[in-house]
Amino acid sequence: YRNYELFCDLIQEFLNDNPDMGVSNIYDGLEHLTCAEIKLDDDDDNAQEIFERINSTGVPLSLSDKIRNFVLMTDTDQDRLYEDYWLKAEQILSKDQLEGFFLDYLNFKMDGFAKESTAYDEFKALYARGQYTNESMLEEIYHYVQQYHAFYYGDEKRFSSTVNHLLRSLQTLKQTTVYLFLFSVFDDFDAGVIDDETLCKVLRLLLNYSIRRLICEVGSNSLRGLYKTLYGRVFNRPENKNNYYDSIVSFLLQLTSKDVMPSDAEFVAALKERNLYRKKVQFTRDYTG
């Protein structure tokens, strides 16, 4: 019935704003309306779930489309929420980046790993578990979208030129799995837990670690799991934040798995022995200014 009232109001508003138009013009417009019929199996198909997943042309919705609909469609304040949060997020991330962001955001927030096929259900579970409102969820999404944009391009207004250079260097190396760790590190920077100098040291460490692994041909399969749990494992004791950078270094150096940081000797040997010219690897120089 709310939909019926909405259309009545819209039609009346249209007629008031366009006195030269009449009901016949609306009928003419309806003749161009295309309807899609989707037959459901009474036993297995849930109509609400199906309409959550398709757009007006019957094309499957993307993850970001489904999340947008979930947090906006049922909210009476949806126009303001859209303009204050969602539109701004769409303006700073491309469609593909927004899809990648939501997978990384979910992996950052969840205990396990999100897959594309289950990501929307995981998002709804996160929403319920965290007792979010639509606005609090959109506020958090926009906060991390801004971080994600900075990870890709830097942010001259928020961060120093050194931080921005180091972020772009990580992006040059295509080390995007590190974002699962950086979300928390940048939260600490925003909260004043660490300063610019410490943030730069952490980013240089991650860049050093990444380059050593690339040159020494250490497989990257385990990196996502490492970075997902790294913050919690390093700072499982709050006092470790008093020596923020040293705590991260100490943890990485104590690793005995395949995620161990390659030693200086291993790195030098790899530089001498590997045929680096045949590798499709992009290199970056650290910035110390």
Positions of the model-derived regions?
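Nucleic acid-processing catalytic cores of prokaryotic defense/repair systems
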Residues: 1, 26-33, 38-48, 52, ...
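Glycine-rich phosphate-binding loops of NTPases
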Residues: 1-21
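Mid-sequence acidic-hydrophobic segments that form the walls
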Residues: 14, 53, 57, 185, ...
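Solvent-exposed "coupling" segments
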Residues: 20, 24, 28-31, 146
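Short, functionally important structural connectors and interaction interfaces within domains
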Residues: 22-25, 53, 162-165
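A cross-family structural signal marking well-folded subdomains
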Residues: 34-39, 62-286
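Histidine-centered nuclease catalytic patch
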Residues: 289
